[in-house]
């Protein structure tokens, strides 16, 4: 161990306060394959040197506190401390820089996203010496990944369960999200599924309210699924939201869904919490249920560029905690999401190995060592005119989810579903024939609408609808 990184905690105790950088800033440190690596965007208070701010982040998110303590001499600080091993400026930002911090693996409980986040981001974000702090990325080492189950099933197992290959899956969020009775809700589900969708979905805040208790909703949705399957010959599903006020109630709802023969359930993983989510993911694997994940509340954490946590970190955490689908923005719809950044974390969700690529916001090479992948879900303000772009951007291993873009069809839910299915099939066929979806997309949709009156009606309704606002979160 080099003299610069060694901490002589055992050579007598001297009370007082010393600069964090004397202990936690170690630019000569060589990172280990077992370290968890973090990239923080740091905005220090005026007068705080970058090295001191970076060291403070490493200290306060690992073994350090504001003063020297005599119990430092009872352990090996060098074994357990976090280390700020690199500082680099943020281009175009005078007062910001990226601090790279390495954490020894022994700081973390095996298989616990909850403990990982409690350590890395649990306390340091309120530190007075920092004006703002954002966790941009994490490198999760294979040794730690192997302590997690991850997604209940993964992409290939889901396709095998559904017997659907060679195209994105189609979904729809039932609207209005609140206020429908269980029977009318089930009717809307049935119409969408018989029209050609693969899935329908509870919205994130549909749990068990006075107008529609969860058990009634589950029963009517199961009836809709079976009826649509009998009519179409295709396997169908509805994301039954099992999110609840307690873990016990959540599992009770999941058990009932399994008893009904439902293929998939749903969880709001941020509002529900990582402990609840991991518990549900384990239940789903043990009982053959797919698990759809909604990211409700994510923008509270990830939207501001200078403070919080980037969604790519939340996406990695979800892959560890467990989920077969997760909402990931659309690039072209109503929700925030710049293209290169979005595709960066989409690859982190799906692929087994992702190289470092700063142009897409990926700070570290990530090896998932065979952990199953997660299907990204594109949802929010999308309609048939977006289908070519969505197919080109997200590829086959994705779920394209049209809520208003199905239920807002002038002829009703089933024709809305038909329009989306026809548009998707046309785009997939055109792509397979070698046509350029990005350049010829509108023409492909127009050609398909000539033999599909449902698609033609949808094209007319949404021909002027665009959501063109600059992204807040950019590279």
Swiss-Prot record:
User: How does this chain assemble?
Assistant: Heterohexadecamer of 8 large chains and 8 small chains; disulfide-linked. The disulfide link is formed within the large subunit homodimers.
Q: What does this protein do?
A: RuBisCO catalyzes two reactions: the carboxylation of D-ribulose 1,5-bisphosphate, the primary event in carbon dioxide fixation, as well as the oxidative fragmentation of the pentose substrate in the photorespiration process. Both reactions occur simultaneously and in competition at the same active site.
Q: Which amino acid positions bind Mg(2+), per UniProt?
A: 201, 203-204
Q: What else is known?
A: The basic functional RuBisCO is composed of a large chain homodimer in a 'head-to-tail' conformation. In form I RuBisCO this homodimer is arranged in a barrel-like tetramer with the small subunits forming a tetrameric 'cap' on each end of the 'barrel'.
What is one Gene Ontology biological process annotated in the Swiss-Prot or TrEMBL record? photorespiration
Give the Gene Ontology MF terms in alphabetical order: magnesium ion binding; monooxygenase activity; ribulose-bisphosphate carboxylase activity
Q: What does the organism's lineage look like at the top? A: Eukaryota, Viridiplantae, Streptophyta, Embryophyta, Tracheophyta
Cofactor binding note: Binds 1 Mg(2+) ion per subunit.
Give the gene that encodes this protein: rbcL
Where are residues bearing N-acetylproline located in the sequence?
A: 3
The name on file for this protein is Ribulose bisphosphate carboxylase large chain
Active site residues according to the UniProt entry: 175 (proton acceptor), 294 (proton acceptor)
The EC number(s) this enzyme carries: 4.1.1.39
Propeptide residues according to the Swiss-Prot or TrEMBL record: 1-2
Q: How is it modified after translation?
A: The disulfide bond which can form in the large chain dimeric partners within the hexadecamer appears to be associated with oxidative stress and protein turnover.
Q: Where in the cell is it found?
A: Plastid, Chloroplast
User: To which species is this protein native?
Assistant: Carica papaya
For this protein, the record's InterPro entries field holds: RuBisCO (IPR033966), RuBisCo_large_chain_AS (IPR020878), RuBisCO_lsu_C (IPR000685), RuBisCO_lsu_C_sf (IPR036376), RuBisCO_lsu_fd_N (IPR017443), RuBisCO_lsu_N_sf (IPR036422), RuBisCO_lsuI (IPR020888)
């Amino acid at each position: 161990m080099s003299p610069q990184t060694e901490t002589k905690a055992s050579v007598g105790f001297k009370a007082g306060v010393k600069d964090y950088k004397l202990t936690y800033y170690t630019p000569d440190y060589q990172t280990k394959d077992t370290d968890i690596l973090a990239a923080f965007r740091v905005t220090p208070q005026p007068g705080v040197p970058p090295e001191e701010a970076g060291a403070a982040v490493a200290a306060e998110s690992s073994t350090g506190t504001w003063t020297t303590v005599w119990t430092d001499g009872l352990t090996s600080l060098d074994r357990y401390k976090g280390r700020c091993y690199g500082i680099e400026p943020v281009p175009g930002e005078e007062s910001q820089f990226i601090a790279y911090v390495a954490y020894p693996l022994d700081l973390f409980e095996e298989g616990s996203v909850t403990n990982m986040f409690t350590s890395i981001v649990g306390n340091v974000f309120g530190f007075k010496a920092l004006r703002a702090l954002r966790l941009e990325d994490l490198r999760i080492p294979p040794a730690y990944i192997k302590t997690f189950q991850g997604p209940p099933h993964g992409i290939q197992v889901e396709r095998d369960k559904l017997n659907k290959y060679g195209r994105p899956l189609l979904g729809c969020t039932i609207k209005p999200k609140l206020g429908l009775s269980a029977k009318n809700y089930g009717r809307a589900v049935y119409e969408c599924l018989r029209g050609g969708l693969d899935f329908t979905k509870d919205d994130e805040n549909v749990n068990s309210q006075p107008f529609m208790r969860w058990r009634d909703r589950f029963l009517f949705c199961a009836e809709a699924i079976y009826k649509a399957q009998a009519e179409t010959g295709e396997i169908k599903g509805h994301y039954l939201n099992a999110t609840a006020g307690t873990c016990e109630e959540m599992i009770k709802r999941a058990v009932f869904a399994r008893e009904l023969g439902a293929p998939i359930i749903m969880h709001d993983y941020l509002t529900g919490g990582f402990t609840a989510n991991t518990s549900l993911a384990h239940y789903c694997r043990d009982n053959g249920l797919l698990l759809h994940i909604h990211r409700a509340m994510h923008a509270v954490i990830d939207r501001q560029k200078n403070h919080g946590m980037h969604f790519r970190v939340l996406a990695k955490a979800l892959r560890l905690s467990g989920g077969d689908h997760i909402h990931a923005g659309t690039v072209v719809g109503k929700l925030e999401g710049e293209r290169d950044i979005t595709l960066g974390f989409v690859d982190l969700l799906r692929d087994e190995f992702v190289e470092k690529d700063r142009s897409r916001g990926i700070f570290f090479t990530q090896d998932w060592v065979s952990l199953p992948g997660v299907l990204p879900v594109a949802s929010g303000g999308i309609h048939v005119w977006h289908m070519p772009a969505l197919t080109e951007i997200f590829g086959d291993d994705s779920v394209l989810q049209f809520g208003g873009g199905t239920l807002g069809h002038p002829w009703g839910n089933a024709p809305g579903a038909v329009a989306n299915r026809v548009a998707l099939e046309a785009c997939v066929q055109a792509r397979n024939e070698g046509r350029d979806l990005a350049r010829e997309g509108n023409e492909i949709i127009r050609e398909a609408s000539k033999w599909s009156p449902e698609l033609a009606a949808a094209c007319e309704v949404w021909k002027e609808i665009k959501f063109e606002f600059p992204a807040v979160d950019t590279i």
